[in-house]
């Protein structure tokens, strides 16, 4: 069996332990966050990324911007929906920077993104 990627480990822990346990968020909020990452994985699959090989460094600021554009163009999402998705990505990468301090700069580049 292949070893899981750092992204797979982080997103699994984030959705199952951190949001539900440590943050005690509602099931609907957790579902919204999960849906964001389902869409991100779909987008990355369309970009010919192998889902089981995605690493944290593969999700950079440029990719997030392309993802948000894809949501608008391909899925017809409004600016407010895109902001919800960006907020979920920001929250995840704030979590990642504490779990993987070596990723701090990478995470800060993503959490600095805003929609114009």
Model regions: which residues?
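Acidic, low-complexity proline/glycine-rich segments
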Residues: 1-8
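N-terminal core-binding DNA-recognition domain of tyrosine recombinases/integrases
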Residues: 13-28, 34, 38-116
């Amino acid at each position: 069996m292949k070893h899981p990627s750092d992204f797979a480990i982080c997103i699994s822990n984030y959705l199952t332990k951190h949001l539900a346990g440590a943050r005690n968020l509602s099931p609907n909020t957790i579902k919204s966050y999960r849906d964001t990452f389902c869409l991100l994985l779909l987008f990355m699959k369309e970009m010919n990324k192998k889902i089981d090989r995605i690493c944290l460094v593969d999700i950079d600021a440029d990719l997030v911007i392309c993802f948000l554009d894809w949501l608008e163009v391909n899925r017809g999402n409004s600016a407010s929906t895109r902001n919800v998705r960006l907020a979920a990505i920001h929250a995840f990468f704030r979590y990642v920077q504490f779990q993987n301090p070596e990723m701090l700069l990478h995470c800060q580049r993503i959490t600095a993104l805003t929609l114009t």
